Amino acid sequence: MRQIPLVVVLLLAYAARLQGLISVTNAAVGAKPGPHAGRDLDGSTTSMSVNVDDEERGLSDMLKRLRSMLFDANSATKGQALKKDAKSTKSVKAAGAASNAKKVGQLRHMWNQIKNVEYKGNVKYLAIIYVICILSVLGILGTVFAINRNISNQYIHE
């Protein structure tokens, strides 16, 4: 039972990393100005400005969205909106299919956002490191589970 908070922390860290990558991609697409540096012919820097608001707000926005998804009081209005939809009012089966299609659309949108991240330089190496860390944590948890199960089976047979 002690591993559950660790898994939750790791999942939140992974979500924060993923949200940071997505917010950086969205910031690059938007009209907000990015880092700017002006140089003379001599090579000396004349002016420099950096905008890091999007990266700083990534984790707080993610936590706000998570809180609103978990404790959303507007679930009744969402249900009424599904009932008003012409396709979902035909039958219970159609309502289930409409909500499943909506979920598939959301998953496809998330997958497209992940695919649009450019893995260059440090981002590429960080992604490789995170994958190795996640796989090693899963391996460690699997090993712990196997050891616990083996020990409990030994007590039963004795």
From Swiss-Prot:
One of its GO terms (cellular component) is membrane. It is a single-pass type I membrane protein. Glycans are attached at residue 150. Residues 120-158 are annotated as: Host BKI1-binding. The chain crosses the membrane at residues 127-147. Keywords: Glycoprotein, Host cell membrane, Host membrane, Membrane, Secreted, Signal, Transmembrane, Transmembrane helix, Virulence. Its main location: secreted. The keyword Signal applies. Residues 1-20 form the signal peptide. Induction: Expression is induced during infection of host grapevine. The RxLR-dEER motif acts to carry the protein into the host cell cytoplasm through binding to cell surface phosphatidylinositol-3-phosphate. Secreted effector that suppresses pathogen-associated molecular pattern (PAMP)-triggered immunity (PTI) in host plants. Suppresses both defense-related brassinosteroid (BR) and ERECTA (ER) signaling pathways in planta by interacting with host BRI1 kinase inhibitor 1 (BKI1) at the host plasma membrane, leading to a host dwarf phenotype. Belongs to the RxLR effector family. This is Secreted RxLR effector protein 131. It comes from Plasmopara viticola (Downy mildew of grapevine).
